[in-house]
Protein backbone atom coordinates (compact mmCIF):
# COMPACT_ATOMS: atom_id res chain seq x y z
CA UNK A 1 0.00 0.00 0.00
CA UNK A 2 2.76 2.45 0.90
CA UNK A 3 4.37 2.06 -2.52
CA UNK A 4 1.09 2.91 -4.21
CA UNK A 5 0.90 5.98 -1.98
CA UNK A 6 4.48 6.88 -2.94
CA UNK A 7 3.59 6.64 -6.63
CA UNK A 8 0.67 9.02 -6.09
CA UNK A 9 2.96 11.42 -4.20
CA UNK A 10 5.44 11.30 -7.08
CA UNK A 11 2.61 12.00 -9.55
CA UNK A 12 1.48 14.88 -7.31
CA UNK A 13 5.00 16.30 -7.33
CA UNK A 14 5.37 16.01 -11.10
CA UNK A 15 1.99 17.68 -11.63
CA UNK A 16 3.05 20.55 -9.37
CA UNK A 17 6.36 20.96 -11.20
CA UNK A 18 4.29 21.35 -14.37
CA UNK A 19 1.99 23.80 -12.57
CA UNK A 20 5.02 25.80 -11.41
CA UNK A 21 6.19 26.03 -15.01
CA UNK A 22 2.75 27.25 -16.11
CA UNK A 23 2.78 29.92 -13.41
CA UNK A 24 6.31 30.90 -14.51
CA UNK A 25 4.98 31.47 -18.03
CA UNK A 26 2.25 33.65 -16.53
CA UNK A 27 4.90 35.64 -14.67
CA UNK A 28 6.91 36.20 -17.85
CA UNK A 29 3.92 38.05 -19.34
CA UNK A 30 3.84 40.53 -16.44
CA UNK A 31 5.61 43.88 -16.38
CA UNK A 32 8.81 43.72 -14.32
CA UNK A 33 7.90 44.74 -10.80
CA UNK A 34 6.38 43.54 -7.56
CA UNK A 35 3.62 41.44 -9.18
CA UNK A 36 6.09 39.61 -11.40
CA UNK A 37 8.46 39.13 -8.47
CA UNK A 38 5.73 37.66 -6.27
CA UNK A 39 4.63 35.33 -9.06
CA UNK A 40 8.23 34.12 -9.47
CA UNK A 41 8.47 33.64 -5.70
CA UNK A 42 5.31 31.49 -5.85
CA UNK A 43 6.87 29.48 -8.68
CA UNK A 44 9.99 28.92 -6.60
CA UNK A 45 7.97 27.82 -3.55
CA UNK A 46 5.71 25.49 -5.53
CA UNK A 47 8.64 23.89 -7.36
CA UNK A 48 10.56 23.46 -4.09
CA UNK A 49 7.60 21.77 -2.40
CA UNK A 50 7.09 19.53 -5.45
CA UNK A 51 10.74 18.42 -5.45
CA UNK A 52 10.65 17.84 -1.68
CA UNK A 53 7.48 15.72 -1.96
CA UNK A 54 9.04 13.60 -4.71
CA UNK A 55 12.24 13.12 -2.69
CA UNK A 56 10.33 12.15 0.46
CA UNK A 57 8.18 9.74 -1.56
CA UNK A 58 11.23 8.00 -3.04
CA UNK A 59 13.38 7.93 0.10
CA UNK A 60 10.77 7.45 2.84
CA UNK A 61 7.23 6.70 1.63
CA UNK A 62 8.35 3.91 -0.68
CA UNK A 63 9.70 2.08 2.39
CA UNK A 64 6.69 2.95 4.56
CA UNK A 65 8.72 5.15 6.92
CA UNK A 66 6.50 6.99 9.45
CA UNK A 67 8.59 10.17 9.22
CA UNK A 68 8.01 10.27 5.46
CA UNK A 69 4.32 9.68 6.03
CA UNK A 70 4.04 12.79 8.23
CA UNK A 71 6.36 14.93 6.09
CA UNK A 72 4.43 14.38 2.87
CA UNK A 73 1.08 14.55 4.63
CA UNK A 74 2.03 18.02 5.92
CA UNK A 75 3.67 19.30 2.71
CA UNK A 76 0.90 18.24 0.36
CA UNK A 77 -1.95 19.15 2.71
CA UNK A 78 -0.73 22.71 3.31
CA UNK A 79 -0.15 23.19 -0.42
CA UNK A 80 -3.44 21.73 -1.67
CA UNK A 81 -5.70 23.21 1.01
CA UNK A 82 -4.44 26.67 0.03
CA UNK A 83 -4.96 25.87 -3.65
CA UNK A 84 -8.50 24.63 -3.01
CA UNK A 85 -9.43 27.66 -0.89
CA UNK A 86 -7.87 30.39 -3.01
CA UNK A 87 -8.10 29.02 -6.57
CA UNK A 88 -10.64 26.19 -6.95
CA UNK A 89 -13.39 27.53 -4.66
CA UNK A 90 -13.17 30.94 -6.32
CA UNK A 91 -13.44 29.28 -9.75
CA UNK A 92 -10.21 30.82 -11.08
CA UNK A 93 -9.56 27.44 -12.65
CA UNK A 94 -12.14 24.99 -14.02
CA UNK A 95 -12.87 21.99 -11.81
CA UNK A 96 -11.10 19.90 -14.41
CA UNK A 97 -8.12 19.98 -14.38
CA UNK A 98 -8.30 21.95 -11.10
CA UNK A 99 -9.20 18.93 -8.99
CA UNK A 100 -6.47 16.68 -10.42
CA UNK A 101 -3.91 17.77 -7.82
CA UNK A 102 -6.29 17.38 -4.87
CA UNK A 103 -7.38 13.97 -6.22
CA UNK A 104 -3.75 12.79 -6.34
CA UNK A 105 -3.26 14.23 -2.84
CA UNK A 106 -6.26 12.32 -1.42
CA UNK A 107 -5.18 9.07 -3.11
CA UNK A 108 -1.59 9.46 -1.86
CA UNK A 109 -2.78 10.13 1.69
CA UNK A 110 -5.27 7.25 1.54
CA UNK A 111 -2.77 4.63 0.36
CA UNK A 112 0.08 5.82 2.56
CA UNK A 113 -2.28 5.81 5.57
CA UNK A 114 -3.33 2.25 4.75
CA UNK A 115 0.36 1.36 4.55
CA UNK A 116 0.94 2.82 8.01
CA UNK A 117 -1.97 0.81 9.41
CA UNK A 118 -0.48 -2.38 7.99
CA UNK A 119 2.82 -1.94 9.88
CA UNK A 120 0.94 -1.27 13.11
CA UNK A 121 -1.40 -4.26 12.77
Each predicted region: which residue ranges?
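Membrane-helix boundary connector in multi-pass membrane proteins
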Residues: 80-101, 115-121
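Helix-coil boundary and interhelical linker segments in multi-pass alpha-helical membrane proteins
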Residues: 1-4, 63, 116-121
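Membrane-water interface at the C-terminal end of transmembrane alpha helices
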Residues: 19, 105-121
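Non-cytosolic membrane-interface motifs at loop->transmembrane helix junctions
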Residues: 32-36, 68-71, 92-103
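Hydrophobic alpha-helical membrane segments
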Residues: 49, 68-86, 105-108
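Core segments of alpha-helical transmembrane spans in multipass integral membrane proteins
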Residues: 14-23, 31-60, 74-79
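Interfacial segments of alpha-helical transmembrane regions
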Residues: 1-11, 68-73
Amino acid sequence: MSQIGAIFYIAWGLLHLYAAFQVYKLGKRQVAGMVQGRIYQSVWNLAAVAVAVIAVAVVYNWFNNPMGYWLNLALTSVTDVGFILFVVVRRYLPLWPGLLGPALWILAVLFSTLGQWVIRA
